[in-house]
């Protein structure tokens, strides 16, 4: 897994791996630093997903469980406008791969000597691409490239 602080001073990413005899789960959360407590959110969501996966919940169920618990934590700590994170979770089992994500932390597949993006960002520019308003090549430099629709 690759993480980078980008233009920010601190990297608020948190990642973990869960390995069992029949599968491997990889969890990556990228805390939103501009909202405060992104590091808290990324650690909390990663740990919550890991615990849910240990209970044999699916990747999707684990993310929903983490979202529910993060919302409860935000409310309890009066932090509804902070403690935000993206999440990407990949499960490998035999020759099968499943993933789920929220935000703009991407999943790529290395295929035929090149990387192929498998996930689609939950961002304003991606929405504009989907509507046909801009081209995919314009996402990288779009003024709203960091504006997410889901976190």
PLM regions: where:
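PP2C/PPM-type serine/threonine phosphatase catalytic domain
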Residues: 1-151
